[in-house]
Structure formats: structure tokens, C-alpha cells
Amino acid sequence: LHEVVHSSRDARRKQTLPKLSSAERDTLIKKFHPDHREAAYRPVAFGPNEGELTVRELASVLEGDSPIVEDLPLDPDYIVDVLVIGGGGAGCVAALHAHTEGAKVLLATKLRLADSNSVMAQGGMQIAVAPNDSPVQHFLDTLKGGHMKNDHDLLKTMVEEGPSIAKWLIELGVLFDRDPGGNLHVKKGGGSTKERLLTCSDYTGLEIMRVLKDEVLNQKIQLLEFAAAVELLSDERGACAGAVLRDLDNKRYVVVAAKAVILATGGIGRLHIQGFPTSNHYGATGDGLALAYRIGARLTQMDTFQYHPSGGAYPEQLAGQLVTEGIRSEGGHLVNVNGQRFVNELDTRDVVASSIIRE
């Protein structure tokens, strides 16, 4: 196989593979993408999303019982303005912004601060900062990549506020890659028509979390580590009013009363949906989804999940090891057993993942 790949390399370098048309993409995805495997889904048995389909692993989590007893004393151990649950990128940013606005903040995380998917991200993040780019173009690229199913308001906020967030991160101390002229260096990312990928070498998430973690500690934001949220609390109106945490060190419950609760608990990769390996960190088990569901929140887009196209498959101990999109951005090829390319490596992730499964 090594010889086949090596012998085809020069010819592959001269190839330009077109991206698929909308019709070709839809046909490919419906036939091969894991989101379209009917046997992997079942209806949720009860709750706000009763009868709606989701993967079996998530449905089981949503239907799980509360781990706390009904007569647990709810006298608060902490009273705060804002409780942030989750210590990754989103949790740290939420805590910092709330703190800046004068709120009394408590950040609780079930592992250590910064133990998250954020710290493991390698390839970079797409923000329209280049002179030939714009938030409008970023919006259109993302809308196309999402098959027009995106929440337009959320997408508009993301692309418009992206440049200011990049500026804020730089002011905090994040060292994004620069070109020889000192300008931000951008790369081509999957599904984009412009070079807009901001990177910190191949450890972008680690660099961002280094800075965010330090800032949370420097601002002396109250922090509870190894404190897993196990239940959200509601007031007499049914509004969320805090949470019960489980102190994993001494096995006791901690009650937090809060005027606002922000769930920043990350994804569900460690449920190993449909048996797939994952590069997610060990805390990504869908806790926040279950917490929100039990208090009455309706979940959206439960039938759609992201499957990262490239990761380690062999040897066995490397299964699930992330192979960053940045490798494909720098010109890496995906080839089959005959040494042939079979997809534009920078097409959208659902297209690339489906093409790999097809091969």
C-alpha cells in the first residue's frame, strides 16, 4: 500500500477535484452519512421531545432517572448571579463576560478547568478577517454547508461577532499565526470559498484555552472543579434557579442558587454514537442535554450530528485520534486502496465523511 500511495503521488499533485453539486451532495449524504441510518434512531419515550427521533445512545441518556433523592435538602451552599456549568472554551468565555458586566459568577466543571474538547482542537477557527473576505461571504458559505437548515439569527451573530472575538482573544494574549508582514495568517478550511482559518500552529485550541484559563484564574472567578452538575433546580414559576452539583472528591452534594444558569457542557462524542470512535475528551457525555431536558427544555436538531472525516483507524490504540482538517488544508490527500483521490478534501465535512464511508 505504501508503494501504491508513493507511486501515485506526483500524478495526484496535478489533480484538481471539483466539489460536488448540490444534487450530488444530497444523493451521497443520504446514502452514506450516519445521520441517515434509520436503524440507529428511535423515538424519545417521553418529555418535551416525545416521539421525535434521535440516536439510541442519546435517547437513553435523556430518559435516564435523576440521580438525587426527592428529599435532598436544598438549602444553598452558594448564592450567585450567574452559574456557568462547563469549563471549556464556551464556559470560560461566558464566565469572563458575565464577570466583566459585574455579575457574581460561579464556574463549575466536572473535571478540571479547561478539560474539554476546546483544548484538543487543532485545525483552527473560521473568522472573516482577511481583506478579501467578509461576514456576508462567511454567512453564505456556512448556510450552504448547512444545507440551508441553519438558524439564521444564530449564524448572523456568529459571523458578525467573529472578528471582534478574534480581536478580544488577541488582546488577552492568544498568539495566532502571522505572515511575514505581521498580519494574521489565514488558511483554507473545508466548505469555505475564502481563506479564513485562524490558527496557532497545530495546537489552536490549546493556545486559546491556555489564555482563557489564565484569565479566569487572574480575574479570581469562583471555581469548583470536579463538581459535576446532576440536576437543575426550578422556582415556583418553573424557571431555572440553580443546580445541584456532585462533589466528586468527597461524594457530597452542593446546592447552588443562581439568577441565571449557563449550560456550556459540550457535546456527546463519548457516547460513541453508532459505535464510532471519537476524539472527544472523556467528559463529553451529553450531561447538559439531559439536565436541560429534565427541567423541561425542548431540544432542537436531535437528528443531526457531526462526524469528523479524518481520524486514526490503525493501529488499534490510535483509533479515534484526531487527524486535523489542517492537514488537508495544507494539501494532504485522501486516497483509496488504489492510491486514487476520491473527494475534494476541502469539501464540507458531511461530504468528506460520507465519501470515506463509501470507499
Predicted regions: what they are:
Residues 1-81:
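Extreme N-terminal leader/targeting segments of oxidoreductases
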Residues 99-125, 131:
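Glycine-rich FAD pyrophosphate-binding loop
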Residues 36, 45-54, 171-252, 257, ...:
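Conserved redox-cofactor binding core of oxidoreductases
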Residues 83-85, 255-266, 292:
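Short hydrophobic core segments
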Residues 88-90, 112, 203, 268:
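Residue-level detector of alpha-helix initiation sites
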Residues 1-7, 291, 297-359:
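An anion/pyrophosphate-binding glycine-rich loop and adjacent beta-alpha core
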Residues 127-158:
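Glycine-rich active-site loop/strand segments that organize a redox cofactor
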Residues 81-107:
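N-terminal Rossmann-like FAD-binding beta1-loop-alpha1 element of flavoenzymes
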